[in-house]
Amino acid sequence: MDLAAAAEPGAGSQHLEVRDEVAEKCQKLFLDFLEEFQSSDGEIKYLQLAEELIRPERNTLVVSFVDLEQFNQQLSTTIQEEFYRVYPYLCRALKTFVKDRKEIPLAKDFYVAFQDLPTRHKIRELTSSRIGLLTRISGQVVRTHPVHPELVSGTFLCLDCQTVIRDVEQQFKYTQPNICRNPVCANRRRFLLDTNKSRFVDFQKVRIQETQAELPRGSIPRSLEVILRAEAVESAQAGDKCDFTGTLIVVPDVSKLSTPGARAETNSRVSGVDGYETEGIRGLRALGVRDLSYRLVFLACCVAPTNPRFGGKELRDEEQTAESIKNQMTVKEWEKVFEMSQDKNLYHNLCTSLFPTIHGNDEVKRGVLLMLFGGVPKTTGEGTSLRGDINVCIVGDPSTAKSQFLKHVEEFSPRAVYTSGKASSAAGLTAAVVRDEESHEFVIEAGALMLADNGVCCIDEFDKMDVRDQVAIHEAMEQQTISITKAGVKATLNARTSILAAANPISGHYDRSKSLKQNINLSAPIMSRFDLFFILVDECNEVTDYAIARRIVDLHSRIEESIDRVYSLDDIRRYLLFARQFKPKISKESEDFIVEQYKHLRQRDGSGVTKSSWRITVRQLESMIRLSEAMARMHCCDEVQPKHVKEAFRLLNKSIIRVETPDVNLDQEEEIQMEVDEGAGGINGHADSPAPVNGINGYNEDINQESAPKASLRLGFSEYCRISNLIVLHLRKVEEEEDESALKRSELVNWYLKEIESEIDSEEELINKKRIIEKVIHRLTHYDHVLIELTQAGLKGSTEGSESYEEDPYLVVNPNYLLED
């Protein structure tokens, strides 16, 4: 830009004017390109775009480098190789082009931005050989600074002779004139900046980092500072993966000047008796001169999302409409989206296409798919936000493909962050306040949840996180904000992200006899914030093991052939983007159905037959609503239908019920009674009564046999539920058929034995089955309170046979009991 300053007319009549013929030729050719290049329909392509620049807020014209190559190959090559040198002349050509057609303010500057460069470079490929060349790089934005005004061209006033010195180019730091332009004035230091006549431009500094896909083996991600000017400011936010087009420049490292180790030495010399120096000056340090180091910075003129249409920031952009998305697609792409929306088997096909390498685990695939579609975020009249994002946690044994789900989602979703719970701190997950090296101001550096804003944050080893780190994400999981108050910075940041977490059980393997809460090391507040819990158990099943082994071997031997996708990932991304624009409303019918299902969950939570994995709260009701909305979105419906609620309830039901309950001990009451009798210790005199010594009567042997430990009668939980459901259904059927009806216990036992008559082969088995059904009825009556024994006062009429009635009471089903599906 110093050459451009020298080429400015009127830069000083006493100085020799240096003409850059190459740059001036580029200026003329670029002006010809703007005036002559036509689009496919025969119109001048950049005319209308240039006319929009007269608006006060516009000053940058975006030019496709492909168009430039088509127009003049030599011009495009010169611009690419001498970009820093010719850039001011290109901006002047644009100003001339606009001035010829519209009236513009004289002081307004115009800028050119190039996009669609054919090659993209990695951050670690930027060396000093690429300084000044037009380059395109990509990376993820990890830190953004506030927008500041930057002094581009200064106007100075000489304090000695009052001469005005215009257009002093700033070399990326505050630069004063070397000497006053007045020939009779020798001032070199005393100048005053006239801010009213100087030119400023918007300036923002961002830091980008290499993406994981670009990292060589065993390398740490490198970062680079990018300078954005004019319209490019605020076009990239923390977490965005963007392409930056511009040039590599060298700037003085001002931060090194203020470090303690670089202080100048001015008084190190020893003075003699008369005040003279005893030694001469040795080295530059003795003169107080510091070594000025330099660093590489990327000066960007254009910023674009890495995947501009169906990725980056726009996948979760709530402001777009279905019509605007349709306009972004080609006819073929839109036909594919429409075809997918009409697919009767869309739910299954999307799951298999998204996770083709994972065998089984269909429920987890469905839950993760609904998480990607998400619910509808809402704001109440008081301003309270209700989140629409769905949080999913996968708990399971080792080698059950938990991390594979997280990796698949990270690769598929354009804005996803993968992190490990053990290696992450609270600041790394939320946000950190750091001091800027140059301005020494505190700035906020985005953590994983901020980087995944409007995306998915995948957290592996979630149970290994420290408790204080888990507490830090409470707010982000429910309110979807991150509040920071530290180091004089008070801010509330957005973290509108879905969390997909994977956790291992406490003992390494899931204990089926314990509830979910007892199996994982998570607090109750964290657990209630997850919409879905999926439990993966590594079972020894011959059929399943063969299928999994067959799948893995196929993947290793025939990678391309074994991956069978109905839809490509790009098709799914386009369909996701389109479907997420729907804002389904809940119909009256669905509303009643949701309330009814929630009542079922609450009542079952308090019943004794089945215990839930954790407490059912209002958050589970909101989870059901979000899942129902995600189902409606997936089918591109404007209204939530009862079938959507039914599927949401089924998924929620899978995660709320524990995997397996321990066997039911039917002799529990007798064992407790025996313990009580043993503890009595002969108070009633039974233990002290003498027994026959010789055992002539035979009682002593029987007593010894009975006192031997007896195996308790146990029944599998599933079998216990099956028998109880049979009993309940039969009793209700009898109640419906007859008005005044109730079965006696003996009648119920006889009915059950008759039902299973074909399963009984011997008298001993009959006695055993009869004992089991009697114990089950006793437990259902006195422990689970599913059945009720009618008292004598509750029956109409008869007062006879009260003794027999107490031994063989009438049984009815508790009216509050809900039969399990």
Swiss-Prot record:
It is found in: Nucleus; Chromosome. It comes from the Eukaryota. Changing residue 763 to A/D: Impairs interaction with CTD1. The modification N-acetylmethionine is found at residue 1. ADP binds at residues 619, 622. The modification N6-acetyllysine is found at residue 643. Component of the MCM2-7 complex. The complex forms a toroidal hexameric ring with the proposed subunit order MCM2-MCM6-MCM4-MCM7-MCM3-MCM5. Component of the CMG helicase complex, a hexameric ring of related MCM2-7 subunits stabilized by CDC45 and the tetrameric GINS complex. May interact with MCM10. Interacts with TIPIN. Interacts with CDT1. Interacts with MCMBP. Interacts with DDI2. Belongs to the MCM family. This is DNA replication licensing factor MCM6. It comes from Homo sapiens (Human). The lineage of its organism: Eukaryota, Metazoa, Chordata, Craniata, Vertebrata. The gene is MCM6.
